[in-house]
Amino acid sequence: MFNFKRKRKIDVTGSTVKTLDWTNVSLSQYIELQDLVLENEDELEQEDIMLQEIQILYKVDPLSLDLQTFKKYVESLKFMKKEIPKMKIKDKYNLGGNIYYLHKKLEQFKVGQYIDYQRIMQTKKGIETYPEFLALFITTEEDGTYGDGYDVAQVITDIRKYMSIADATSIAAFFLKSCKLYTALSILSSMWRTRKVIKDRKTRKQLRKKTMHLINLVLNGE
């Protein structure tokens, strides 16, 4: 007995099977796929999960498909066994018809961005953070400033709904690494400024040890 729930607003017939890969699966679809497995791993049979995957990715009602068409959809899911590819990071992205610009220079980071970055990293984990995290570096104008003259919530929505998981993971990996390095360099710079005013050799040594431990935590989480 299938434990399958139909969703609203889907193509009932699904006669045309589109070719999908990770470059045209949206971030929201990937999050939904991930939640499907994590939340129902012990409750759903593999067949139920497969039906849900077809519905999420193709927005069709799999139970209404003829057997020949259903077989094509099942075959089309093979790409999910492959790794998500690393994509070249672009300067601008078209998300649902809206053009957004990516800002890669962390030295232009504003206090508001850093506060939001810390909040996101402390309150959320994993792929669910990506829409908010990526919105820190994306604006509606080429020379725009974070949150200035546009709705950040709309950017987050467009990233979640329209950015491919391949683009999202590639951009996130770049900025997560960059943010860690930038934070580590800031800590190191602060240590050297502090060391200059500390005369006691033992205290300076302890400061250096604590600083290097903190940098290791930032870079490696250890």
Segments and roles (model prediction):
Residues 1-222:
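Charged interaction scaffolds used for protein-protein
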